[in-house]
């Protein structure tokens, strides 16, 4: 009798254990999840400071491989599979020059896993609390990586810490880069914007499948840095993304950022480079596409490095009009947004790649020459820029610091603030930040004058101090930096949950209203108002009005920064 009781009791214990496991998402070292395409098997990871593991699924396809006839075409649905698919190894990165990934590892003091490269690259990674399963309906945060639309990968970011600490589900994605992501013929044969179409395909996959991993398809926040932030800003403006996401975070990048707009003569030059390098006939778009689809990946990569003419285009579909037109019309979907910049966006990483000589100091003549070359400001107006920025600056280091600030203003701060104002005026909830902390890990590797450089905030957002896997994002973090990382993870996750970053034990983050309040993110968090208000006025009002009086707005050399930021009303007056 007692033996029967013991047997029954043990059986009951097993039933309760199994039931608990189901309730908690079947916590196992080899988690299995169903998708509409087939079953996947992931793995588990741990993070510092948390006992419960994170389920990790790597390399899940969200589109068919863009090979052969699918090169330079919209992404197609992924191919289903019948066996259990192992999702435990990193996918190939999209075709790019891997040299820059290796260089960035050293410059950024990070470590990436060993990654292959292929055009077969449309995959995503998922990081979820181990208990999450169908029915958990956790907020989803989809990260769109940056890299200047030329380099980058889903797998150089690890969402484990953010998922573990904040009970959110993290998705990191990949999209075609360089010429593979943006080649176009400006007609129906190859309208371009393939990279943005890939991002739409990833969002559609999330919409249809993320509930099986414990995510809520009705609570999707897209976030990204640099080119990823530009992509997010573009997705907000595009009518094709309607209903696919509900909140957005743009870290150091927006759609109206200068250098993204190319003119017809630049495209013609790019096509001529194609003709010269690939020996393809560019007079017939169909023939040209057939020729290019027969070229090797390396041949196309080499071609992309010889011309930068192929970038985002107004294709009548993803971009019905120029981004500034769409922004100023305020007909875009007004989702709650966080927009932010770092306080020295062009402090180190970007100059190291584009013009390293200026880091050692610059005189005013050299500085103005660089400004003229990079911004295409006509020589007769350079004295206006010099007076506004360099008045009273004499030492080489003072001029260098001012020049770096100018480039940061032009390419990041002013476009970000103009975008924030337009979102606010379209009745979209907006929160703005300036990240101000120089990471301690650069104490001995960066010049002392560098403050918070481009991308420095990312290691804090992803909980870099708490990662212990293949991706190393933040070695040598101080206790203050660990606390700042925890706070930033909480701000970002709170926003993903509700559209408001504020929460218990966090300094108040005011909305970006008519007072233009913003958060200063540093080890001691505080609030500011009207960030660089005079600089915004200079680039969007003072200088354009002076130039419009002399019809300089009609010149083909009109500076791209102003062309990107001017409201259509001023352009029409000038014409």
UniProtKB/Swiss-Prot annotation:
Signal peptide range in chain numbering: 1-28
Keyword terms of this UniProt record: Disulfide bond, Glycoprotein, Hydrolase, Secreted, Serine esterase, Signal
Coiled-coil features, chain-numbered ranges: none
Chemical reaction(s) catalysed: a carboxylic ester + H2O = an alcohol + a carboxylate + H(+)
Active site: 226 (acyl-ester intermediate), 345 (charge relay system), 454 (charge relay system)
A Pfam family per the record: COesterase
EC number(s) per entry: 3.1.1.1
Major localization class: secreted
Compartment(s) of residence: Secreted
Recorded GO CC terms: extracellular region
Gene3D superfamilies: alpha/beta hydrolase
Family of this protein: Belongs to the type-B carboxylesterase/lipase family.
Record function comment: Involved in the detoxification of xenobiotics and in the activation of ester and amide prodrugs.
Name of this protein: Carboxylesterase 5A
Organism for this UniProt entry: Rattus norvegicus
Gene: Ces5a
């Amino acid at each position: 009798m007692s033996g029967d009781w013991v047997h029954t009791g043990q059986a009951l214990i097993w039933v309760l254990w199994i039931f608990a496991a189901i309730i908690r998402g079947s916590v196992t070292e080899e988690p299995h999840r169903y998708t509409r395409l087939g079953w996947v098997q992931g793995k588990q990871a741990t993070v510092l400071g948390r006992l419960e593991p994170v389920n990790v699924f790597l390399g899940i396809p969200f589109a068919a491989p863009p090979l052969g006839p699918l090169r330079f075409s919209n992404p197609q649905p992924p191919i289903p599979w019948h066996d259990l698919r192992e999702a435990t190894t990193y996918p190939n990165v999209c075709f790019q020059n891997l040299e820059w990934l290796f260089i960035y590892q050293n410059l950024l003091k990070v470590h990436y896993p060993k990654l292959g490269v292929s055009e077969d690259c449309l995959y995503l990674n998922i990081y979820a609390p181990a208990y999450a399963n169908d029915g958990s309906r956790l907020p989803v945060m989809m990260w769109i990586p940056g890299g200047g639309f030329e380099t980058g990968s889903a797998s150089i970011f690890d969402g484990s810490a953010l998922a573990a600490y904040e009970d959110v589900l993290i998705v990191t994605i990949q999209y075609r880069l360089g010429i593979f992501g943006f080649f176009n013929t400006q007609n129906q044969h190859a309208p371009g914007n393939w990279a943005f179409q890939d991002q739409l395909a990833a969002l559609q996959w999330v919409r249809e499948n993320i509930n099986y991993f414990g995510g809520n398809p009705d609570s999707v926040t897209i976030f990204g840095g640099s080119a990823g932030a530009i992509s997010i800003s573009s997705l907000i403006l595009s009518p094709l993304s309607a209903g696919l996401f509900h909140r957005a975070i743009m870290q150091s990048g927006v759609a109206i950022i200068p250098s993204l707009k190319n003119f017809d003569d630049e495209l013609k030059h790019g096509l001529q480079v194609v003709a010269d390098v690939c020996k393809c006939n560019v007079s017939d778009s169909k023939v040209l596409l057939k020729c290019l689809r027969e070229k090797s990946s390396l041949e196309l990569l080499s071609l992309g490095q010889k011309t930068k003419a192929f970038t985002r285009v107004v294709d009548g579909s993803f971009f019905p009009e120029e981004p500034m037109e769409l922004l100023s019309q305020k007909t875009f979907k007004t989702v709650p947004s966080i927009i932010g910049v770092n306080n020295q966006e062009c402090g180190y990483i970007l100059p190291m790649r584009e013009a390293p000589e200026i880091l050692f100091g610059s005189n005013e003549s050299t500085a103005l020459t660089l400004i003229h070359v990079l911004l295409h400001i006509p020589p007769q107006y350079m004295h206006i820029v010099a007076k506004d920025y360099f008045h009273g600056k004499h030492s080489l280091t003072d001029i260098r610091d001012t020049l770096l600030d100018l480039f940061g203003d032009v390419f990041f701060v002013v476009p970000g603030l103009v975008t924030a104002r337009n979102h606010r005026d379209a009745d979209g909830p907006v929160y703005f930040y300036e990240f101000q902390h120089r990471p301690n890990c650069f104490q001995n590797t960066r010049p002392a004058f560098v403050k918070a450089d481009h991308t420095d905030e990312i290691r804090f957002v992803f909980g870099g101090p708490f990662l212990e896997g293949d991706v190393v994002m933040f070695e040598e973090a101080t206790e203050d930096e660990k606390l700042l990382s925890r706070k930033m993870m909480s701000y970002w996750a709170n926003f993903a949950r509700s559209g408001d970053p504020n929460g218990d034990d966090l300094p108040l983050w005011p909305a970006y209203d008519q007072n233009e309040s913003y958060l200063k993110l540093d080890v001691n968090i505080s609030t500011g108002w009207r960030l660089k208000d005079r600089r915004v006025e200079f680039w969007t009002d003072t200088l354009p009005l002076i130039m419009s009086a002399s019809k300089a707005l009609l010149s083909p050399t009109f500076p791209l920064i102003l062309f990107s930021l001017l409201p259509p009303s001023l352009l029409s007056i000038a014409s």
